[in-house]
Amino acid sequence: MKLICVFIVAVLLLTACQLNAADDSRDTQKHRALRSTTKLSMSKKDSCVPDGDSCLFSRIPCCGTCSSRSKSCVG
């Protein structure tokens, strides 16, 4: 029973701290954090295999196209 009471008090204390911190930081953040899905889509767009590198076993797409003859990326 004591353990449950300690747990409840701890949860209430942590919740109060979260609410207090949220009130203090309102409208002070200049650059808001991007969502993880946005970060993933941006990183996928930015990373590609450059021209001349092998595209045969690469998980990353070519910046241009993958040549079927040479199995390398072509711009």
From Swiss-Prot:
Q: Which InterPro entries match?
A: Conotoxin
Q: Which GO terms describe its molecular function?
A: ion channel inhibitor activity; toxin activity
Instruction: State the GO CC annotations.
Output: extracellular region
For this UniProt entry, which residues form the secretion signal? 1-21
Q: Does the keyword Disulfide bond apply?
A: yes
Tell me, in one coarse class, where this protein mainly resides.
secreted
The intrachain disulfides are 48-63, 55-66, 62-73
Q: According to its UniProt record, which protein family does this protein belong to?
A: Belongs to the conotoxin O1 superfamily.
Recorded domain comment: The presence of a 'disulfide through disulfide knot' structurally defines this protein as a knottin.
* Name of the protein: Conotoxin Bu6
* Organism, as annotated: Conus bullatus (Bubble cone)
